[in-house]
């Protein structure tokens, strides 16, 4: 330990009893190697990729046929996107439901949602056996509707039981799932469905958020008439009772809507088939399983297709081997169906744990998640860094108000977790738990920098690089020096490509133009690969620390790599600023949200750091607050980090998944047209125009006469 090492905040009581340590011992013995530390194991897993992932398959008892070795071409670069387990056959849903046979009465899913004064459904507990039956029924409905391997099934609605059943039934047939959250605007949904042309749409009649009913049915006519190929069948789920609100009556909608293209069904009718056990169509490891859309802000959303086998074995690596989640655990990840954390959550079923679903606002009543944790004995709670920050401001004394008796891990993602919030969690929520800041994202539908139960937690750092991923920064072995996050070796959760995939994956692809397939694959290559070595570029700016306690190096994420700031040659990420300001002291001063970007000056040779600040209603950015911001940044970082301008704005633009958009706003304030930003990808596109005006004014004041970015 050196004086610059961050404080160790937690350490496992019994690291050798963790799954990762046991697997390392098994590998050491089997391969005659000595893997004494996590770092040894991580290095071995990166150097022996076929063997490592094959060991994960065996250790996890994956149901299916692994096929013979070799399991991957070890010489292939990430850019070659090699096929993994080329002869394997497996089914994702079969593996998620595999615990039903031995433990039919275990609770598989607890389905909960936000209440209103006139809508208070009790939590639904669904046993393993019941879940299998529900999937069999939904599968029968899908078969009757003609759904087959490779067809797309889309879901639009809340994170409720029927969404999970739809996902499981879709994948049981080898069909491809895609989902949009209930709060996605209809334009965003049109843009997604138009790209993937689903055969079947399952849609909720509405949901509750912020104690209000949000009906979706009124949006359906616009959706259907806008799609060039409306789904042949649409199934409507009564998540809100008909009588709640006359705008949401499913009966009226079913009677009133006849467009002749899509056939409407009630969920209850669609699944009206005998329960029993579904059939499982085993497909190839590299066959598509679901399509996620990236929250890119220019152009159409990227339709990222993930591979079946990778999604299965990597989730087991993540949840069981590195997270020690297993039967008896209750896993609650706060998510909507529009975020990749949805798949991350449902994949917890394969461990035998109970998965808790909650649909609604996590903060309208800030006690909500903590009440669920107490009421249902949640042991693993996943949330976002933003949520933890908000809780620290609006409901700080969680640990005094809640027992949190079984809680042993809190996972945080979505954006980097500031060091102060590590302190907050350990001081105000619970001391004896693993606080895992984790990072990955839509592009890989998983986590590749994250938690490991065998390792300590250091303040402000992600614990480790996950097994099987040769993560590095472009500053390479010069650890502690920030650089771009890259993956140096191929990995099995690399997406198959963007939709539409090459024809070998398209059973019904005869109507897809080759030019569209080629354009999608070219966009895929362009999105992630930019050097001759064929490394994967993830788009993050990161610092990987020296290894401590054998942890393979901790990671500090510093913002999107293309949002890197560089005033007077000092490179730093927006997170360096956010981590100072995301602090209850600033919330108390009225700061709600901030965004940092660079304004190019000196012909583009230099830039000035601009901090946009949104204040809570009725609060103004006064001189005292400005002074506090500057002095805090100066003392926490350096004088070079102090923004050249601090500007109050009415809103900070956010993607549908709640991410700030530094890169497009940087372009806008430097003169690029706002039309390049796709408004359907934002929660609050109306605020963009304000940034156009601010950009013009700032450029005029800085004497920038010609816009420097297009
Ligand atoms: C795991 C993640 O990285 C989640 C996200 O930020 O989208």
Describe every region a protein language model picked out.
Residues 310-330, 338-379, 394-395:
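Conserved AMP-binding/adenylation subdomain of ANL enzymes
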Residues 121-129, 280-282, 289-313:
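Conserved AMP-binding A3 loop
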Residues 233, 595-601, 610-612, 630-710:
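Conserved C-terminal "lid"/linker of ANL adenylate-forming enzymes
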Residues 158, 200-219, 241, 336, ...:
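Adenylate-forming
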Residues 155, 180-206, 220, 374, ...:
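AMP-binding/adenylate-forming catalytic core of the ANL superfamily
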Residues 39-44, 93, 109-168, 185-190, ...:
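Conserved AMP-binding/adenylate-forming core of the ANL superfamily
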Residues 172-267, 384-385, 390:
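Structural core segment of the AMP-binding/adenylate-forming
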Residues 321, 408-410, 417-554, 562-564, ...:
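Conserved AMP-binding/adenylate-forming
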């Amino acid at each position: 330990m050196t004086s610059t090492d961050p404080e160790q905040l937690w350490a496992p009581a019994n690291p050798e009893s963790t799954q990762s340590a046991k697997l390392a011992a098994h590998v050491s013995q089997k391969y005659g190697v000595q893997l004494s530390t996590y770092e040894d194991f991580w290095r071995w897993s990166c150097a022996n990729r076929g063997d490592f992932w094959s060991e994960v398959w065996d250790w996890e008892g994956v149901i299916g046929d692994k096929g013979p070795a070799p399991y991957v071409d070890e010489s292939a670069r990430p850019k070659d996107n090699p096929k993994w387990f080329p002869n394997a056959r497996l089914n994702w849903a079969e593996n998620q439901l595999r615990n039903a046979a031995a433990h039919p009465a275990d609770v598989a899913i607890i389905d909960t949602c936000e209440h209103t004064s006139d809508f208070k459904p009790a939590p639904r507990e669904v046993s393993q056996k019941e879940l299998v039956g529900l999937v069999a029924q939904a599968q029968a409905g899908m078969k009757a509707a003609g759904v087959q391997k490779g067809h797309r099934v889309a879901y639009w609605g809340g994170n409720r039981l029927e969404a999970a059943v739809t996902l499981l039934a879709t994948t049981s047939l080898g069909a491809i799932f895609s989902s949009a959250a209930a709060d996605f605007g209809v334009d965003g949904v049109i843009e997604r469905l138009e790209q993937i042309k689903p055969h079947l749409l399952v849609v909720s009649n509405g949901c509750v958020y912020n104690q209000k009913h949000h009906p979706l049915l009124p949006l359906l006519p616009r959706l259907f008439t806008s799609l060039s190929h409306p789904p042949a069948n649409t199934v409507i789920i009564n998540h809100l009772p008909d009588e709640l609100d006359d705008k949401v009556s499913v009966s009226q909608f079913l009677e009133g809507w006849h467009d002749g293209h899509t056939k409407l069904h009630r969920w209850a009718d669609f699944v009206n088939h005998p329960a029993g056990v579904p059939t499982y169509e085993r497909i190839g490891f590299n066959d598509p399983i679901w399509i996620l859309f990236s929250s890119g802000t220019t152009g159409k959303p990227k339709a990222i297709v993930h591979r079946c086998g990778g999604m299965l074995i990597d989730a087991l690596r993540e949840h069981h081997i590195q997270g020690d989640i297993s039967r008896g655990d209750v896993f609650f990840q706060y998510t909507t169906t529009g975020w990749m954390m949805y798949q991350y959550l449902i994949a917890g079923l394969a461990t035998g744990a109970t998965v808790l679903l909650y649909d609604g606002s996590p903060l309208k009543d800030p006690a909500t998640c903590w009440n669920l944790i107490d009421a249902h004995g949640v042991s693993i709670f996943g949330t976002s860094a933003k949520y933890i920050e908000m809780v620290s401001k609006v409901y700080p004394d969680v640990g005094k108000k809640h027992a949190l008796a079984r809680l042993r891990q809190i996972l945080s993602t979505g954006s980097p977790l500031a060091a102060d919030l590590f302190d907050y969690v350990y001081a105000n929520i619970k001391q004896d738990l693993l606080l895992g800041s984790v990072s990955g994202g839509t592009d890989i539908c998983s986590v590749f920098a994250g938690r490991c139960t065998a390792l300590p937690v250091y303040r402000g750092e992600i614990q480790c690089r996950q097994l099987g991923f040769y993560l590095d920064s472009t500053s390479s072995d010069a650890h502690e020096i920030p650089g771009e996050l890259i993956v140096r070796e191929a990995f099995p959760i690399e997406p198959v490509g963007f939709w539409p995939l090459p024809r070998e994956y398209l059973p019904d692809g005869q109507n897809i133009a080759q030019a569209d397939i080629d354009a999608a694959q070219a966009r895929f290559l362009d999105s992630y690969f930019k050097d001759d070595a064929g490394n994967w570029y993830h788009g993050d700016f990161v610092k990987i620390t020296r290894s401590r306690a054998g942890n393979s190096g901790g990671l500090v994420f510093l913002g999107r790599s293309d949002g890197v700031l560089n005033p007077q040659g000092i490179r730093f990420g927006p997170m360096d600023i956010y981590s100072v300001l995301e602090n209850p002291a600033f919330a108390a001063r009225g700061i709600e949200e901030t965004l940092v970007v660079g304004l190019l000056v000196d012909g583009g040779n230099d830039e000035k750091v601009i901090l946009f600040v949104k204040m809570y209603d009725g609060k103004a950015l006064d001189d005292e607050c400005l002074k506090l911001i500057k002095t805090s940044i100066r003392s926490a970082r350096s004088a070079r980090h102090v923004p050249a301008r601090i500007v109050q704005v009415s809103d900070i633009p956010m993607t549908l998944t709640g991410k700030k958009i530094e890169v497009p706003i940087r372009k806008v304030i430097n003169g690029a047209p706002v039309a390049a930003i796709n408004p359907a990808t934002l929660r609050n596109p109306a605020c963009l125009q304000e940034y156009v005006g601010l950009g013009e004014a700032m450029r005029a004041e800085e004497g920038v006469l010609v816009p420097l970015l297009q």
